[in-house]
């Protein structure tokens, strides 16, 4: 058991820092004019050409972000200087470890896949359509949980505030962008309206988990709530006090009832961009995912966890098994079904880029703020953007607030007349360490993402319209 706890946390940290932030948006791509991915960051940042996304491959993004989960917080130099040891090792002091934990420790995992998408220029407008599958999950862990794991000393611990939430929905987005003149400045305005179809929602909230640890046993009393909503499922006959497993057994795809698909939502993206200093300085602002999802009671179930207690007696954390006395099942008191409305996690992007050498090189700064229901996170990303050719762009970035030096981002966009290929990551670590038999892993990163996109250019901008200046510059380069 002593080995299982740290290895589980290290596996999660390794997945976060070695292979998978949390809006499923690629910040390094913000100033890459040829990329289609910029539309997801700011509705006014339209690509240079119209496009048709390869179905299922137009924009695929996987992201994870945390304010605590990094290998640096769970692995420490060994006393003999040979390798690393976990936070449970005796050489790591309680205070040294716990000062790195937050009062509330967040982890977000988000996935976005573009199923269908296209966009093009018509007169002075750029129109776009996208059908996206989105998944947003979050976990909140209180500091007392890590205090319990580290200390394992007699006393009382309060783990209230533990939350697990997952929202999964289908997004249909229709957008357009157009230029307007404000005084002497030309401003590009972008707008996207989104219709949302709720697919699945689950949430677990722990109102109270009081743990009493002494020399003979440790006991836990749990109070909380569970809510779930799955499109097409029927939970209407579940009443009274039942086992939680009975709810799980209802999740059978063969029992989907199309009449019970009723969860829906609306959202909007807004964006603007303008230029100063003879077009050398570009300033933009984007607000994304301003909206909600209403989860229908027709396919929902919820209840409370109460009077749930369990105890471990005769434990020895150096053994693989524990002598336990636990309830045979987790009981759920079903509550009357009702509609539940949840706000989306909105994102504010404010960017500025200064260009030199006829826009072949640009230096950008992006301020991103993420508004979640229980917390707000902020990130500042600096980037150097290179455009040596009209069909090739590369960007190198560094996020200044959430990650340490030695973590950088890189994105590549190849967009000749017949293909548009994008690949990038916001967080690539340069510092690595070796722990036990686990492969070499990055240290110091709290977030990681991977984005990939493939589309086919279908049109070019018209001679008139708000891309005329850009097209003239591209023509001069040719």
Predicted region positions:
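Bacterial Sec-dependent N-terminal signal peptides
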Residues: 1-27, 352
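Subset of outer-membrane beta-barrel
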Residues: 25-478
